[in-house]
């Protein structure tokens, strides 16, 4: 096998916020890669298998996903196509090329009806079409591959790219003096795309044992906590951020009330957990500010 820095990465979902942060990291490290956007490569189409194989990668990162949670309720077949059939095809590629597969999954595979952090082996019980489609994708991988697969469950992703909660809140903080209402009864782990990209890189480099891992920034917070932290970092009045309940924001989707993911699997394989969420936010905040300034 090629030396790590010479290993060629293949990245699906290459235009998404996570992939773009991962590409930034690979560029910094001088690691070769090919990244396909969903327009360039449809992971649910069997032709994607031959396209990736022709590229002869040493490692496959599946970031392609249907992530619109609300739309998944309306179009479950479309979500399943990307989130289940896609991973099935990616597992086939990895199997035929005999290369590692790193697949990104979600906290939505759990019910969210707990008060204790969810472990990697906790009972999966998705409460939404999106969560079910992602769980089925996980099962496609574990069914197809005996080794060299890494399923990284993450949550509440944000960063300088694409659309996400943190950028939306920052825009409201700096363009208006009006109060905003933010949910404070959903508890999870805000996770930067930079932190997750770095963890993916470490997994690829260290080649820890195959399996499921929880890849989120540590600690826990509500959406209100995250919004308050953003207001504070940008020097705006935190009192403008008003706590609200989920019931005040009607939705087709039943979102997890408590989706904190247990990180203990990392220490068992000799790896550190990802940084605490506030520290991770502060590290990436200047980049988010620059991105928002460009978009305004």
Where are these regions (language model features)?
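Catalytic helix-loop patch of NAD(P)-dependent Rossmann-fold dehydrogenases
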Residues: 81-89, 96, 109-152, 156-157
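Adenosine-cofactor binding site in Rossmann-like domains, unifying the SAM/SAH pocket
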Residues: 27, 31-48
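NAD(P)-dependent short-chain dehydrogenase/reductase
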Residues: 139-188, 194-201
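SDR active-site strand-loop-helix element
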Residues: 12, 36, 60-64, 101-106, ...
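Conserved C-terminal active-site "lid" loop/helix of NAD(P)H-dependent oxidoreductases
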Residues: 222-228, 245-284, 288-293
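Mid/C-terminal beta-alpha module of Rossmann-like enzyme folds, strongest
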Residues: 199, 206-252, 292-296
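N-terminal Rossmann NAD(P)H-binding glycine-rich loop of SDR-like oxidoreductase domains
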Residues: 2, 7-25
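NAD(P)H-binding glycine-rich loop region in Rossmannoid oxidoreductase-like domains
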Residues: 46-82, 95
């Amino acid at each position: 096998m090629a030396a790590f820095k010479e290993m060629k990465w293949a990245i699906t979902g290459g235009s998404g916020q996570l992939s773009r942060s991962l590409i930034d990291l690979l560029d910094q490290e001088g690691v070769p890669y090919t990244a396909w956007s969903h327009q360039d490569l449809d992971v649910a189409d069997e032709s994607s298998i031959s396209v990736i194989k022709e590229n002869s990668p040493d490692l496959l990162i599946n970031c392609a996903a249907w992530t619109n949670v609300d739309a998944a309720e309306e179009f479950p077949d479309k979500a399943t196509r990307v989130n289940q059939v896609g991973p099935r095809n990616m597992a086939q590629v990895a199997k035929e090329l005999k290369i590692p597969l790193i697949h990104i999954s979600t906290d939505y595979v759990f019910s969210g009806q707990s008060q204790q952090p969810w472990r990697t082996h906790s009972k999966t019980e998705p409460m939404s079409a999106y969560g079910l489609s992602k769980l089925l994708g996980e099962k496609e991988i574990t069914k197809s591959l005996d080794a060299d697969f890494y399923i990284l469950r993450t949550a509440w992703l944000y960063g300088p790219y694409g659309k996400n909660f943190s950028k939306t809140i920052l825009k409201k903080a700096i363009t208006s003096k009006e109060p905003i209402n933010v949910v404070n009864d959903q508890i999870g782990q805000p996770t930067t795309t930079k932190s997750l990209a770095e963890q993916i890189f470490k997994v690829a480099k260290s080649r820890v044992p195959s399996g499921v891992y929880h890849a989120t920034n540590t600690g826990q917070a509500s959406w209100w906590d995250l919004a308050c932290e953003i207001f504070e970092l940008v020097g705006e009045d935190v009192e403008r951020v008003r706590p609200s309940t989920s019931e005040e924001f009607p939705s087709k989707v039943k979102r997890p009330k408590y989706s904190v993911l247990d990180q203990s699997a990392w220490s068992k394989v000799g790896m550190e957990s990802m940084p605490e969420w506030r520290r991770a936010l502060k590290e990436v905040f200047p980049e988010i500010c620059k991105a928002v300034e460009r978009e305004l």
